[in-house]
Amino acid sequence: MDEILEEELEKKESEEFEERIVEIRRTAKVTKGGKTLSFRVLAVVGNRKGKVGVGVGKAREVPEAIRKAIAAARASVVEIPLYKTTIPHEVFGRQDASKVLLRPAAPGTGIIAGSTVRAVVELAGVQNVLTKCLGSTASVNLALATLNGLKDLVSPEKAAKLRDITPAQVLYGARKEA
């Protein structure tokens, strides 16, 4: 009975998250006996409703590396606040030498981003955003920088409570009262 419930839970979890392989890279370790080949995979999982995760997997075979990357991505899933179809405010994500600027955009703008950042943002559920990558463009670091930036997002309600103003003032700027 417990096995059936566990299987159903696993099916629901796998159906809930969409998986995307961003990069498969062949790496080589040079040894006395020659080169030892292995593969590194960067995967992103998300439900397009505010949950997203990034993972890296390494193995001698591609399918095993993919499995490990997806497992790592599922383990790193974080929830982010969304405001309509965009992010609530501008945010800057960093990972090592990679930096990513994420800006909210008007409806109809779409996702203005490179392939790595686009994968993370799309699977998070953001439909309109402007991004700019600064520094290193290594795909793993860009994906992690984007995730770090998304982690730093604060919902308008929470920001308003912290700053003791209304959520509208957070989103549209403070207006002078006559």
From Swiss-Prot:
- Give the UniProt family note: Belongs to the universal ribosomal protein uS5 family.
Identify the coding gene.
Answer: rpsE
Record's GO cellular component terms = small ribosomal subunit
Report the InterPro entries cross-referenced here. Answer: Ribosomal_Su5_D2-typ_SF (IPR020568), Ribosomal_uS5 (IPR000851), Ribosomal_uS5_bac-type (IPR005712), Ribosomal_uS5_C (IPR005324), Ribosomal_uS5_N (IPR013810), Ribosomal_uS5_N_CS (IPR018192), Ribsml_uS5_D2-typ_fold_subgr (IPR014721)
Q: What does the entry note on its domains?
A: The N-terminal domain interacts with the head of the 30S subunit; the C-terminal domain interacts with the body and contacts protein S4. The interaction surface between S4 and S5 is involved in control of translational fidelity.
The protein's name is Small ribosomal subunit protein uS5
Q: Does the keyword rRNA-binding apply?
A: yes
Q: Which GO terms describe its biological process?
A: translation
UniProt keyword annotation of rRNA-binding present: yes
State the oligomer form and interacting partners.
Part of the 30S ribosomal subunit. Contacts proteins S4 and S8.
Annotated ranges, domain S5 DRBM: 17-80
Q: What does this protein do?
A: With S4 and S12 plays an important role in translational accuracy.
Q: Where is the signal peptide, in residue numbers?
A: none
The record's section on SUPFAM superfamilies has: dsRNA-binding domain-like, Ribosomal protein S5 domain 2-like
For molecular function, the Gene Ontology terms on record are: rRNA binding; structural constituent of ribosome
- Top-rank lineage group of the source organism: Bacteria
What keywords appear on the UniProt entry? Ribonucleoprotein, Ribosomal protein, RNA-binding, rRNA-binding
